[in-house]
UniProtKB/Swiss-Prot annotation:
Residues where Zn(2+) 2 binds: C88, C91, C94, C102
Single Gene Ontology MF annotation: oxidoreductase activity
Organism: Streptomyces lividus
Descriptive protein name: 2-deoxy-scyllo-inosamine dehydrogenase
Pfam families recorded: ADH_N, ADH_zinc_N
UniProt binding sites for Zn(2+) 1: C37, H59, E143
Length: 339
């Protein structure tokens, strides 16, 4: 089978290897689509935490179960998506429903082979069935949509609240769709790339601004009716975190969703204290897979425009380049794994 391998930082190669064999309790999945996440790009550049080389990347995927080993045989032939988090299931964090904090955590696409391949093994317990007829292309966005829903819920967004988002990449745009599902209003998007601002505007956002320091603050000072109750920070840049803190209303909430391990910067924490803000981090899909599947399969959430650039695995160099440069209106590069 074909697989994309990250051998070392900034070294991605297409390889041929034997089909993997599922271990007890695992399933073998024939993959259909996998989208390229910002964390994949950081991993490719060598600036990601808790990852190992060499490894097959990819964790936003869809596919079909073709074999199981000691798991539910009824899964064979079923279209599925799955959680990248492979945790012990018994530690304190796992018992509290926080598997991303597990001390024995393994993650598909980072510490064990992921979905940029024709086939992949995965614990059967990580799989989620797709309703018949669900688009496998759209379904590769179930995992990031679940991440967005989990973040919006951790920030406790309620109907009628105003929300601003910094960063209009894939997760930022999905956050906007998740806010809408919770009845919130996205009043502003801060994003430096013009084509991505256009993508945000197409979602019906009240206003978009560039991502330079001070842009969002200037907007809400000029238009106080846009000042958000909540700011969701999806870019991972320290300057954007500071911008969120200054732009949100007094007594408001700031959600930290994006992060970049290579970025450091100064902060002015007095704004947090003086404005009595709540900062809330969010990582992973939590328990939102089922809801994300329902929203995509029913058409309540449309991700077609988000999936902007399709590639075969053979064209992986261009897929990564376009995504890294955020060129040509790229919001999500994705691989068609059945071409």
């Amino acid at each position: 089978m074909k697989a994309l391998m990250f051998e070392a930082p900034e070294r991605a190669v297409l390889i041929q290897r034997d089909l993997p064999e599922p271990a007890p309790g695992e399933a073998l999945v024939r993959l259909a689509y996998n989208s390229v996440c910002g964390s994949d790009l950081s991993f490719y550049k060598g600036v990601w935490h808790g990852s190992t080389y060499p490894v097959v990347p990819g964790h936003e995927w869809s596919g079909t179960v073709v074999d199981v080993n000691g798991a539910d045989s009824g899964l064979v032939g079923v279209d599925v998506v799955g959680d990248l988090t492979c945790s012990c299931g018994t530690c304190r964090h796992c018992a509290e429903g926080k598997p991303t904090l597990c001390g024995d955590l393994q993650e598909l696409g980072f510490t064990r082979d992921g979905a940029c391949a024709e086939y992949m093994t995965i614990p059967a317990a990580n799989l989620h069935r797709l309703p018949p007829g669900t688009s496998l292309r759209a379904a590769c966005q179930v995992e990031p949509l679940a991440v967005a829903l989990n973040a919006v819920d951790r920030l406790a967004v309620v109907p009628g609240e105003k929300v601003a988002i910094t960063g209009a990449g894939g997760i930022g745009l999905l956050l906007a769709l998740a806010v809408r599902q919770r009845g919130g209003e996205v009043t502003a998007f801060a994003e430096p790339v013009a084509e991505r601002r256009e993508a945000a505007a197409a979602l019906g956002v009240s206003a978009t601004v560039g991502g330079a320091p001070g842009d969002l603050v200037a907007l809400v000072e000029k238009h106080p009716e846009l000042r958000p109750d909540v700011v969701l920070e999806a870019s991972g840049y320290p300057s954007a975190v500071q911008e969120a803190i200054e732009a949100v209303r007094s007594g408001g909430r700031v959600g930290l969703i994006g992060y970049r391990v290579e970025e450091v910067g100064p902060m002015a924490p007095q704004h947090i204290v003086i404005k009595m803000l709540t900062l809330q981090a969010s990582m992973g899909p939590g328990t939102r897979f089922g809801e994300a599947i329902g929203l995509l399969s029913s058409g309540a959430v449309d991700v077609d425009a988000l999936l902007s650039h399709e590639f075969a695995l053979e064209d992986h160099a261009r897929a990564l380049d376009v995504a890294l440069r955020r060129a040509d209106g790229n919001t999500r590069s994705f691989f068609n794994l059945r071409t």
